[in-house]
């Protein structure tokens, strides 16, 4: 199913990985080595949008290889979820997936990470939506506002416009689950 964010005239394919969505949400770093030495990329900068060169999925330079992926320590141990919405329970790419992690102080959001899969050519993060949640009370209204902000530039095509509303509902659900500390079970699928 095609992209609703970050697409170009040359490519509307979506990135299929679940792990990359989680790594994007956790602010992972990618260590690479090549002919000019070693360098480190923020995971958000590792994958690229298609633009006019959709054959290039990453920002690796010629002859570079990934040597390590680093996960920084975070306080998301009990307030996280990964929600994967797909056509069937097994062997299916996500129509929409959401990695959500919250650090709460009481019912206030101190820190938040939110990444989407199945919606763009790369794992999708919008730091403006995350910033809008910081300091807010963890409520459905706050989560709905963040979803609206994150999807403000979403563009559906005839066959996939439903993904915008699916993503909106999924974001609210994932953030609500993370706030409650109840990760989504992959054996049951509740959206509303």
Task: Label every PLM stretch briefly.
Residues 1-192:
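C-terminal structural segment of proteins
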């Amino acid at each position: 199913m095609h992209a609703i964010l970050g697409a170009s005239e040359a490519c509307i394919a979506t990135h299929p990985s679940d792990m990359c969505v989680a790594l994007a949400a956790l602010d992972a770093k990618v260590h690479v080595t090549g002919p000019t030495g070693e360098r480190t990329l923020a995971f958000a900068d590792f994958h690229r949008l298609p633009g006019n060169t959709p054959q290039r999925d990453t920002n690796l330079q010629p002859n570079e290889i990934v040597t390590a992926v680093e996960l920084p320590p975070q306080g998301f141990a009990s307030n996280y979820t990964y929600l994967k919405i797909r056509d069937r329970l097994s062997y299916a790419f996500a129509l929409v997936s959401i990695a959500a992690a919250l650090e709460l102080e009481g019912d206030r959001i101190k820190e938040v990470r939110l990444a989407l899969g199945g919606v763009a050519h790369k794992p999708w993060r919008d730091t403006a939506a995350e910033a809008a949640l910081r300091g807010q009370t963890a409520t459905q209204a706050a989560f709905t506002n963040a979803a609206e902000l994150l999807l403000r530039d979403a563009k559906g095509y005839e066959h996939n416009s439903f993904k915008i509303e699916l993503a909106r509902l999924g974001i609210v659900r994932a953030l609500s689950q993370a706030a409650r500390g109840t990760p989504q079970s992959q054996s049951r699928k509740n959206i509303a």
